[in-house]
Every structure is written in structure tokens, then in C-alpha cells.
Amino acid sequence: MTVPEPRASAPESTAPVWSEEPTPVCPEDLSEGTWELLRAEAKRAMARAYVPYSNYPVGAAGLVDDGRIVGGCNIENASFGVTLCAECSLVSELFMTGGGRLVAFDCVDGEGKTLVPCGRCRQLLLEHGGNDLVINMPSGRAPMSVVLPEAFGPDHLAGTPSEHEAKH
């Protein structure tokens, strides 16, 4: 079985968003070039949004700790409660392409303007990026610990993930 090529960096491109093997990254390593790649992927994803009801497309992009960039778009449904935010699509792609931890995140609307994740999506991003995940917001970049202070997370549940896995 062959592994699919990495996702494109822009709607008109089929080239991967990186040219070399992915290398581990941390929040301190984020350059303006990295943020530009995230913005390009978010815009590419936004162009694929399914929004027949609101006509409000959203695209999201995240940098994974191994150097991959994953993206997602919002997908509406006539039963509004089952509409998927772009962040949900992004986390699905994260797991479909090998998992990992999110290091940086960007989100745009149909005009390419920066959006802040809703509360539900902040919680979702916290689960897969932790307090150090850097979020791009209209007011600037901030770690998740600032964007979602004193958040409920896995540490609040009984047992650690490794203890939970050992029980099953």
C-alpha cells in the first residue's frame, strides 16, 4: 500500500507544504515563514468548505510536532447541531495522517481574516495541543493557556491515559 502525498499548501497547488522530511518543531521554533504556510493551508481548506446554509466558509491549519501541516474546513448540515467546525476536520486529518501534537494553529473566514476558535473548538484543540499550542488571533499570537485559561482537560479525569490503557 502506498502512502498518499502530503496536502497542498494552496488551492492552486499540488505541491506539499514542506520540501524535506518533517523535523520536530516546538513553539519557540515558529518563524514568520511557518505562519505563512499555515495561513496558506487555512485558506486552501476554507475554499473547500461546505456551507450551503450560512455561506460562511472557515478554514483551519495546524502545525504538528513532527513538522506536518494539517488542515480542515467547516462542513454544514441541515440539522445544524451536527455541523462540523473546521477545527473538527483538522483534528480528523491529524489522526488520519499519523497523529501527533499540534504546535501552532491558524483559522480564517471566507475573506481570509483571522478567526478565534469557539469555546468547543478551543477545548478540542487543547486536547490535541496542550497549553503550549500557539493560536493566531486577531489581537496577536498566544498560547492555549491564555486563550483557554484554567481549562478542563485529561488531567482532571481519574487516572492517566497510560493507566486507563492498562485497565483495558
Language-model-derived ranges and their functions:
Residues Y50-Y53:
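Short Gly/Pro-enriched turn/cap motifs at secondary-structure boundaries
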Residues N55-V64:
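Short beta-strand scaffold segments in enzyme catalytic cores
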Residues L63-D65, N74-I75:
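Histidine- and/or cysteine-centered catalytic micro-motif in compact active-site loops
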Residues E41-R44, A86-L94:
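Short, well-ordered amphipathic alpha-helical segments that serve as non-catalytic structural scaffolds
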Residues T2-R48, T97-H168:
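C-terminal binding/interaction regions
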Residues C73-C88:
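Compact, glycine-rich, soluble single-domain proteins
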